[in-house]
């Protein structure tokens, strides 16, 4: 169950992240963005795209979960109670999974959206955002490998880093003994990081959407933002 939960978040991060990045790039390639930025604030546009993708992810997950539970309840006798353990998952594990899973999707979707603004063609998205997918994949496998040492120092460090806390803290709560304050601190760090990444991402979105041609490197985009800030 734990590995499936981690895998579900992993798939949603990539699927909806790429979806948002593709949407941003398509608007840029067909010049729709030029009309949008004249009628709405770029921060609202950017945050709206990311939140829409996240809400779509939540709706899909909710419908799927209701369908699974409903189907199992309807045919529970046929299963012979084989999956009753799924209905007995502790509330703290479910809440941690929901909050940190949502945070993880938001965190990386903001990053994907920013990277989508750095390219002008949809075929360049994988090249530009490939590093994000690599980070998500590395975090996923490291977390799986560390399940055998759930209370080790590596897992504790991962549970506080925003790039990995969504999976590491959930795993620690599900398999180990974690103090409430640890979960709260980790979640506060994740929320603060989401806000920070969202603000930086919206600035990159504003700058990148009106620049056409070759893909813009993320380092170049950050340098441009620093120059604009210092003016």
Q: What positions do the PLM features span?
A:
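Single conserved hydrophobic/aromatic residue that forms the stacking wall/gate
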Residues: 1-7
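Long, hydrophobic alpha-helical segments
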Residues: 7-18
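Membrane-interfacial helix-loop-helix connectors in multipass membrane proteins
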Residues: 69-97, 176-178
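A structural motif at transmembrane helix-loop-helix junctions in multipass membrane proteins
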Residues: 98-134
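Junction motif at the cytosolic side of a transmembrane helix
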Residues: 118-120, 191-231
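Transmembrane helix segments
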Residues: 126-157
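Membrane-interfacial helix-loop-helix junctions in multi-pass membrane proteins
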Residues: 145-160, 164-192, 231
């Amino acid at each position: 169950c734990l590995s499936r939960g981690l895998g579900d978040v992993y798939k949603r991060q990539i699927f909806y992240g790429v979806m948002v990045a593709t949407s941003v790039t398509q608007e840029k390639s067909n010049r729709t963005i030029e009309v949008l930025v004249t009628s709405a604030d770029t921060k609202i546009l950017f945050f709206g795209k990311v939140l829409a993708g996240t809400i779509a992810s939540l709706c899909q997950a909710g419908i799927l979960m209701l369908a699974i539970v409903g189907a199992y309840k309807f045919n529970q006798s046929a299963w012979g109670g084989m999956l009753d353990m799924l209905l007995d998952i502790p509330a703290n594990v479910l809440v941690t999974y929901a909050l940190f899973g949502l945070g993880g999707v938001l965190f990386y979707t903001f990053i994907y959206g920013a990277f989508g603004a750095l390219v002008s063609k949809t075929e360049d998205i994988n090249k530009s955002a490939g590093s994000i997918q690599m980070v998500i994949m590395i975090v996923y496998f490291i977390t799986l490998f560390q399940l055998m040492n759930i209370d080790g120092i590596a897992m504790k460090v991962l549970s506080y880093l925003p790039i990995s806390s969504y999976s590491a803290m959930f795993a620690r709560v599900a398999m180990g003994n974690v103090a409430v304050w640890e979960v709260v601190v980790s979640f506060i760090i994740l929320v603060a990081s989401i806000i920070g990444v969202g603000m930086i991402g919206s600035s990159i979105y504003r700058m990148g959407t009106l620049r056409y041609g070759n893909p813009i490197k993320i380092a170049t985009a950050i340098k441009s933002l620093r120059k604009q800030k210092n003016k």
